């Protein structure tokens, strides 16, 4: 009797650099590649039509590539725990291979399947290929906890073994005598479903700006490396209006679904750098966005509450407002701020926005203007973004809302000035908000300031054809910066809580090839700052707020740990008005000083005015 094997695709929807699939094929007589799709999940999950379309296109491309190997993809309806016991028996399976999933939900699911496989006498092969590193080894190297600063993360990976090279693509030679049993009714039983079959209405659905699949991903990778003149000099290009549009060299959705191997991208960049720079060793900054992705994966892997505020040991408990009406206006692009509304319109239509556009709308929703929880924004991105990734999406929203990691809370993106500096003519606004097309560049970012005659000439009266601004940005941002200031003053006065960590500069490209939901550590013009103050370390490095968990080995602390983090235990009072808001934050033994020095006062046209007097130098002892 021959050896029958199954490879279970989840992410990693590719034939190149797929070590689990290669290992599965070795020694097998038959192999079936399966993807398990839960139709109920399709109808009830918080995932929009663009992302589902991208996934189905990935599956269609994978099936087409498997056909070239005289194989097929088996798309099976159901839930893994129900499907596999049947498949093990029906197909007489001897071994099952999977790509390692680092997310808490994925680890729990895979543990259940491994148990079922063991009971059925099925060998399970697991290989790491969705991340560059073994995340557990990074955590082990850090004393059993994930590093909570990017600088610490960089230090740890510099001590790791060199990365393994991508494995050979699956070819007919790799398959050798391994075959795939395919029945005549395969398409009927195991074909890739359509959007209509999943319950989506496709009437009026425009063509995909981002076609899914490994074939497209590899084409884009070559374009990405060829087109980027900046790669030759390894300089970051300046942001401009064209950067805001989807690029044929963008890679982020393909990395998220695993159509493109992060290791292949890493080594292609390395080879190019060495070719241009005559074999000199590339700096870590070359891989900036790949490493930020890895950083958030590491932070999230042992924290099932990573996407929540409550019960999340690394998240500051901030009393966000609950305002469903304001949230809906933001999500639907009806804020009355053209820059924000154009971004949200592009996101809903195309499933992608530039990483700095993500900064702008996230800041506006949370600490900038609306004071609505980052969790709500994260859910909208999860629905609409093609590259929405559980770990990176949640980590980025916590970071940008000043809820965790590092951030200069006194910086606030201006919803008028930031866009105007990026695209002075307003072409981006006209593209996604045609109702404003008739406005001259002078008023297109703040049309409410246009004289009535200009509004009528543009055939768009503010308050009638396009909404008035939903908030007064200057007032809202002042209030919210003050709120954040009070929260962090309370935290910094609390003995035993380390708050500051240096944030290295991060080369992010022009965003079109960006790999992340956000790109932390970037200083952008068009942001306001409170008090004209800049945090500094004295060595020229930027400083942001960092919540250090108890027992974090690089703070010198120690204590009780739970799933790699400390247990939250201390109540902090939020000093705003009546001082009655309670905040839960974990203590740490080490206390870090806060150095603050005066900085340049912002331009009042482009940025919100400073808030109150300059902050004086403080320290906690």
Curated annotation (Swiss-Prot):
<keyword id="KW-0274">FAD</keyword>
<dbReference type="InterPro" id="IPR014729">
    <property type="entry name" value="Rossmann-like_a/b/a_fold"/>
</dbReference>
<feature type="short sequence motif" description="LIR 1">
    <location>
        <begin position="50"/>
        <end position="54"/>
    </location>
</feature>
<keyword id="KW-0678">Repressor</keyword>
<keyword id="KW-0600">Photoreceptor protein</keyword>
<protein>
    <recommendedName>
        <fullName>Cryptochrome-1</fullName>
    </recommendedName>
</protein>
<dbReference type="GO" id="GO:0032922">
    <property type="term" value="P:circadian regulation of gene expression"/>
</dbReference>
<feature type="short sequence motif" description="LIR 6">
    <location>
        <begin position="285"/>
        <end position="290"/>
    </location>
</feature>
<feature type="short sequence motif" description="LIR 3">
    <location>
        <begin position="151"/>
        <end position="156"/>
    </location>
</feature>
<feature type="short sequence motif" description="LIR 11">
    <location>
        <begin position="430"/>
        <end position="435"/>
    </location>
</feature>
<keyword id="KW-0963">Cytoplasm</keyword>
<feature type="short sequence motif" description="LIR 8">
    <location>
        <begin position="379"/>
        <end position="384"/>
    </location>
</feature>
<dbReference type="GO" id="GO:0097381">
    <property type="term" value="C:photoreceptor disc membrane"/>
</dbReference>
<dbReference type="InterPro" id="IPR002081">
    <property type="entry name" value="Cryptochrome/DNA_photolyase_1"/>
</dbReference>
<dbReference type="Pfam" id="PF03441">
    <property type="entry name" value="FAD_binding_7"/>
</dbReference>
<keyword id="KW-0090">Biological rhythms</keyword>
<dbReference type="GO" id="GO:0045721">
    <property type="term" value="P:negative regulation of gluconeogenesis"/>
</dbReference>
<feature type="short sequence motif" description="LIR 4">
    <location>
        <begin position="255"/>
        <end position="260"/>
    </location>
</feature>
<dbReference type="GO" id="GO:0009416">
    <property type="term" value="P:response to light stimulus"/>
</dbReference>
<feature type="short sequence motif" description="LIR 2">
    <location>
        <begin position="82"/>
        <end position="87"/>
    </location>
</feature>
<dbReference type="GO" id="GO:0045892">
    <property type="term" value="P:negative regulation of DNA-templated transcription"/>
</dbReference>
<dbReference type="GO" id="GO:0005737">
    <property type="term" value="C:cytoplasm"/>
</dbReference>
<keyword id="KW-0805">Transcription regulation</keyword>
<feature type="region of interest" description="Disordered">
    <location>
        <begin position="581"/>
        <end position="621"/>
    </location>
</feature>
<dbReference type="Pfam" id="PF00875">
    <property type="entry name" value="DNA_photolyase"/>
</dbReference>
<dbReference type="InterPro" id="IPR006050">
    <property type="entry name" value="DNA_photolyase_N"/>
</dbReference>
<dbReference type="InterPro" id="IPR036134">
    <property type="entry name" value="Crypto/Photolyase_FAD-like_sf"/>
</dbReference>
<dbReference type="GO" id="GO:0043153">
    <property type="term" value="P:entrainment of circadian clock by photoperiod"/>
</dbReference>
<dbReference type="GO" id="GO:0071949">
    <property type="term" value="F:FAD binding"/>
</dbReference>
<keyword id="KW-0285">Flavoprotein</keyword>
<dbReference type="InterPro" id="IPR005101">
    <property type="entry name" value="Cryptochr/Photolyase_FAD-bd"/>
</dbReference>
<keyword id="KW-0804">Transcription</keyword>
<dbReference type="GO" id="GO:0031398">
    <property type="term" value="P:positive regulation of protein ubiquitination"/>
</dbReference>
<keyword id="KW-0675">Receptor</keyword>
<dbReference type="InterPro" id="IPR036155">
    <property type="entry name" value="Crypto/Photolyase_N_sf"/>
</dbReference>
<feature type="short sequence motif" description="LIR 12">
    <location>
        <begin position="486"/>
        <end position="491"/>
    </location>
</feature>
<feature type="short sequence motif" description="LIR 13">
    <location>
        <begin position="492"/>
        <end position="497"/>
    </location>
</feature>
<comment type="subunit">
    <text>Component of the circadian core oscillator, which includes the CRY proteins, CLOCK or NPAS2, BMAL1 or BMAL2, CSNK1E, and the PER proteins.</text>
</comment>
<keyword id="KW-0716">Sensory transduction</keyword>
<comment type="function">
    <text>Transcriptional repressor which forms a core component of the circadian clock. The circadian clock, an internal time-keeping system, regulates various physiological processes through the generation of approximately 24 hour circadian rhythms in gene expression, which are translated into rhythms in metabolism and behavior. It is derived from the Latin roots 'circa' (about) and 'diem' (day) and acts as an important regulator of a wide array of physiological functions including metabolism, sleep, body temperature, blood pressure, endocrine, immune, cardiovascular, and renal function.</text>
</comment>
<comment type="similarity">
    <text>Belongs to the DNA photolyase class-1 family.</text>
</comment>
<dbReference type="GO" id="GO:0009881">
    <property type="term" value="F:photoreceptor activity"/>
</dbReference>
